[in-house]
Regions:
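N-terminal, polar/charged subdomain of small-to-medium soluble alpha/beta proteins
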Residues: 1-57, 64-106
Length: 106
């Protein structure tokens, strides 16, 4: 998590909310897709939910493949896909006590 957003707001924390069955289905589908498309042996994705603060790790991605280039390409794809398409709802809390739901992930 970054300390500022695209508007340069000073972010104190963020809450990530999700609907468990929908998000689990989405992640499972993404894993199956990248395993097939990037010829991976297997992939693991874990995404934080709940309250996070700047510098917290939000995502862990691990891939197994015959060649590391396949994994590097797959991880890049996964991170971009999660950022733009994952069914996660984000609410930012700012240092000036404002709060706002994130409408678009950039």
């Amino acid at each position: 998590m970054r300390k500022t957003n695209e508007f340069r707001d000073d972010i104190k924390s963020m809450t990530l909310e999700y609907y468990p069955k929908m998000t689990e289905y989405y992640l499972e589908k993404l894993v199956n897709e990248v395993n097939k498309d990037f010829m991976l042996h297997n992939t693991f994705i874990a995404h934080r939910v709940g309250e996070v603060v700047p510098t917290d790790c939000l995502v862990v991605v691990s891939c197994w493949a015959k060649h590391r280039k396949q994994c590097i390409s797959a991880v890049k794809y996964i991170l971009e896909d999660l950022k733009h398409n994952a069914p996660l709802w984000k609410k930012e809390f700012y240092s000036d006590n404002r709060e706002k739901w994130v409408e678009k992930n950039t």
